[in-house]
Amino acid sequence: MTAALTLASASPVSGANDGQIIGKNQITLTGDRLTPEALWAMGRIGTFAVSPDAQKIVYTVSYYSVQQNKSHTVLYLMDANGANPTLLTTTADNESEPAFTPDGQRITFLSGKSGSSQIWEMALDGTSRRQVSFCHKDVEGYKFSPDGKKVIIVHSVDTYTSIEKKYDDLPLSSGMVITDLNYKHWDRYVTTIPHIFVADVQDGRTGDGIDLLNGEPFECPMLPFGGSEQFNWSPDSRHIVYTCRKKTGRDYAISTDSDIYRYDTATGQTENLCKPADYKEPEIDPSRSMEHQAINHLDRDCNVGYDTNPAYSPDGKYVAWLSMARNGY
C-alpha cells in the first residue's frame, strides 16, 4: 500500500533580510510507506547545549524545502524535562552552534546576519541580540572559557600540502595539481583546513586571536566530521585541550593515530598528553595491513589509535577522552 503524504508548511515570515523562513511542516501520513518526501519534511535536530544550572536545553533544528532546494536552521529553547519548547529564531538567517554564557543568563550562537559568520548572543527569550565577534574570517565554531574572558574560535586557513596553489594569473581555473594523498574528503577537496584560535573577550566583544597551530599544516577540529567537541577549556580557564592528527599526505591517509594536546594560555607551550616525550613512531609500510605493523605491537601503551573529544574533570585534575586501541582503519 502506498502512503499518502500531506504537508502543510508553516506560514512564511519575513525576516530581517526580507527572506522567507522555511519552518516546521505539519505532516499527515496514511499508509505504511515512509517516502523521501516525508523524510525531507521532518526537522532534524543538530547541536545542543545544557545550561549551567542544568534546567534548560538550547538546540538547533534544520527544516528543508524541496521546492526551494535549501534549508533553514533555527534555535529552540526548552526545559530539561522536555517541556515548553520555544522557537527563538524569528528571521530567515540561519542560526547554529548555540551555547549558554558561563553565568547562564544569555545564549550565544553563530549567525551570518552581519554578512559573515560571527558569534552573536541574545537573552533567553530570544530578544536583545547583539554581535560579539568581529573577526576578519568566518567563525566556524567557538567555545568560551569558564570565566568568560577568552574564547576559542575556529577559522579555516589555506593549505597546500596535497594540492598546489593555483597560479595567480589563472584564478578561474578549475584544474588542480595533486601532489600527495589526503587531497579530498568525500566530496570536498582539501584546500583549506580548520585551525583553532584563542582570543580575549573585552567589554563583551572579541576579534581575531592567536593561532594555536600557527604554521602547522594540521587540522583541529579534524576533518571531515569534527566539531567543537574536539577542544575544551580547563575549569580554571588557563589550559586548552584539543584533538589533532599531526600528519599530512600519505601518512595522514593510512594512519588513524590522533593525539590529545594541551595548550597553556599563560606560557604558549603545547604538550602531547598521549605520547611519552621520547616516543618515536615506527615506520609504517603502506603495502601491508596495519594489523601486523610494528606500531600496533609496542611494548608500552603509547595511545597509537584514534584519540579524540577531550574534556576536563570538574575539579581540573584529570582529562578524559575517547580512544581506540590500535592504529588503522
Language model regions located:
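Beta-strand-rich domains and repeat architectures in extracellular enzymes and scaffolds
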Residues: 37-73
